Swiss-Prot record:
Component of a complex composed of cytochrome b5, NADH-cytochrome b5 reductase (CYB5R3) and MTARC2. It is found in: Mitochondrion outer membrane; Peroxisome. It is an enzyme of class 1 (oxidoreductase). There is a cross-link at residues 59, 138, 144, 156, 173, 187, 287, 294 (Glycyl lysine isopeptide (Lys-Gly) (interchain with G-Cter in ubiquitin)). Catalyzes the reduction of N-oxygenated molecules, acting as a counterpart of cytochrome P450 and flavin-containing monooxygenases in metabolic cycles. As a component of prodrug-converting system, reduces a multitude of N-hydroxylated prodrugs particularly amidoximes, leading to increased drug bioavailability. May be involved in mitochondrial N(omega)-hydroxy-L-arginine (NOHA) reduction, regulating endogenous nitric oxide levels and biosynthesis. Its cofactor is Mo-molybdopterin. This is Mitochondrial amidoxime reducing component 2. It comes from Macaca fascicularis. One of its GO terms (biological process) is nitrate metabolic process. Keywords: Acetylation, Isopeptide bond, Membrane, Mitochondrion, Mitochondrion outer membrane, Molybdenum, Oxidoreductase, Peroxisome, Transit peptide, Ubl conjugation. Its main location: mitochondrion. Ubiquitinated by PRKN during mitophagy, leading to its degradation and enhancement of mitophagy. Deubiquitinated by USP30. Its EC number is 1.7.-.-. Residues 1-35 form a transit peptide.
Amino acid sequence: MGASSSSALARLGLPAQARPRWLGVAVLGLAAVALGAVAWRRAWPRRRRRLQQVGTVAKLWIYPVKSCKGVPVSEAECTAMGLRSGNLRDRFLLVIKEDGHIVTARQEPRLVLVSITYENNCLIFKAPDMDQLVLPSKQPSSNKLHNCRIFGLDIKGRDCGNEAAQWFTNFLKTEVYRLVQFETNMKGRTSRKLLPTLDQNYQVAYPDCSPLLIMTDASLVDLNTRIEKKMKMENFRPNIVVTGCDAFEEDTWDELLIGSVEVKKIMACPRCILTTVDPDTGVIDRKEPLDTLKSYRLCDPSERELYKLSPLFGIYYSVEKIGSLRVGDPVYRMV
């Protein structure tokens, strides 16, 4: 040990031979302090965020088949790809043409009359004037894998068999259709391809563009004060309905905490002709509620490139933290 080092240790009251052990303890202590400081700084922004209650969960809906009836649930798991209750997953089933192109209530309005329930590990489909269709909740891996086309993007789907195909073909009575199922090992449609100008990074199966759609009952009440034929929430097909807030207050919500789930706003929901399909009759109107919504719910001119001339009603969200939620949960805005 050099003279300068020995004198420094002596000033601390330590013998020269204690240096290796003392320095090891000191280094470990400093490392622990540094790691603790980094962890604290990373956690600090989250701890600092204020929670402002903006409403309460009034309803939760899962739509097992795209464009078919929703299933109301009292609680649900919120996965990165949307709501789940047991083996019911949101929009993990899809009706397609023989060439793989998507079929929705925009083309076949009577799809909204098809209901789905889950019993004994089976999906049960019902529709007017049809015998019920019973399918296993998971399709055999030996079934054909289809290349499906949804709004210009490709995605896989496992065929649900000839019985399901015949059932939907007989019910819709226009052309041959097939039913396919998304599997969790398949690659979803990515946000980078769906909405390349936006920040979030997520995947969806067969929804239009997001894992979640949130609406408020106050906004529907407001619409119904302006329109002759009253609309139902089923016209708009949200996953989460919030009560206890003002009409269109949801326009101002960015990040929300619901139950143990954190979600982040993607964009407002631009509405299309599907909202004009009567959920009770399967008859398409093609005018309302779109005409009324266009009179007061168009986007700001600065956002015209994104939304075009579609009226905005409801908000699309991505799932930032998975968890569970239930009817009655408070909805907090994270500010």
